Each structure stands twice: as C-alpha cells, then as structure tokens.
C-alpha cells in the first residue's frame, strides 16, 4: 500500500496521525530499536529515520548534536539502510528516510531510491533539495513507487506553493514555523492558516512538523 493510501486508511479510525523521528545510531541502533518499540506500542503511524549528516542545515542544536554523536560512533549509510530494513520488517508503521541530498548525490540517485525500496521505506524527506533541482530524482522515485516528501513553508508565496503542490506525492510536510527543528513552536492560528494555504495547492495528506512537542500541540492541530 502506498503512503497516501496508507494515511487515508489510517484516518478512517483516527482524526490525527502521529509521525515520529529517530536519528539513526544515536545513541545507538539498539537504543533506536527500543524507542521504536515504544512508538509502535503507543500507536505511532509513520517514523522518519534520519540518516546522520555532518551539516544538517535544517536541524536545530539538539538534532545537530545527535547527528554529530552518531557519526562519531561510526554510523554509516549502509548501516542506516540495514536498520531501515529491520524496522520495516518488524513494525507495521510506514518508514521514511530523512536526510540531506548529499547522501543521494554521493551514491547516485537511482541507487539511493532503490536502496530505500529494498529496505522497505515508503519515501524520503530531503529538506535541502529545491524542487527545481529534483526532477530526475522524482522521476526515478515514481518508477520505483517511492514518494518524495515535499516541504511547504510559511514564507512560500501562493505561486510557490502551487509549484510545490504539483510535485507533491504521498504527503506534504508543512513546516510550522521559520527556523530549524527541535525548537518549540507556539501553536496559533498562523499554523492553521498555513495548513489551509497548503490544502489549496495539493490533494495529498498534509503533515505538520517542526516543534510539535506536546499533546496540547497535537490537540490544537486535531481536525485541521
């Protein structure tokens, strides 16, 4: 089942799905697996497995530290793909690769997408790859049935959102605020308005991220 169909099926029984995040190899892969066991037991629907990178430009200090510590411990891309395969075979939630374009560039876009597919992943999030430079990667992804997750931001014009919407597959990631991950987002009508703006330009499911950190945040978004 594709990512969009999976989300729509899950939403028949839940008015809000949960997407969680793990930095591969931090503090260790065994700890990651324990975290994922808890996530599965508490009903998480989608998990991003972040492949650590030395310059994680979209991430805040906590995530930067996690990336650095994982790399210092020797985490490799191959280990991350092996772990993704273990996770996708063990749990029923959908798994996404989250990382930076350098990973795809260094191994080649075709191999990158194929490795995600072979590891049981449903898609990927590469926040540093502009949609204008992603046509080949997206074409390869479509051939393999892997979804490129597009980011829509509050600073994007409607014209820009329309362009992003045309490229969206599986789901889009609405960035709740300007800045980097890991900091608190103050839930307000601005976030709801962003979701409404995104909805005008895409028919795929919308996930909201960056600083969603509490039940109160999720309750605020419920039904939006």
Go through each PLM region and give its residues:
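Glycine-rich beta-to-alpha transition loops that act as phosphate-gripper elements at the mouths
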Residues: 22-23, 28, 98-106, 130-131, ...
